[in-house]
């Protein structure tokens, strides 16, 4: 596969990832508003971060494709590394904010409507799994590290969504109101750990 073909594939994958994530954001925000679930809201905030990160990936892939010039005699490949570092930093910051907001709700929880949250999380899981698998495949073909970082973040988001689904199901059968904020804290923390691991892999 030639260099131009790899660049074209990487750019297309980045744009599709951005579009798919925008849809997931809309679905999760609707689910959070209708269910009143803080865990679903946390996932919606994570997905908003995904949109910002996907936009950065689109930029990084485009810049990395530029030929070398007088200011960049070795090309622009470092743009992807910078994009990956930015992705990881923003993910950790959002995780901290979510946990900070969810902890007080352990002691002051409120009833929720889990059906809307279940529908939103179910859609998010399926969408993210498909997009992440494609990004990984494209990253291997194109050697685009920013796509690899985006895929890793989507996998982390999917794991959190599965956990939120389980928590909402448990709430449905038990009506334990503390489950929702606990799920938000637990899976946000796990996502942060996944991000840190990916930093070491990239660096």
Question: Where do the model's predicted regions map?
Answer:
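Alpha-helical transmembrane segments and adjacent TM-loop junctions that form the membrane-embedded core
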Residues: 2-17, 27, 33-35, 39-203
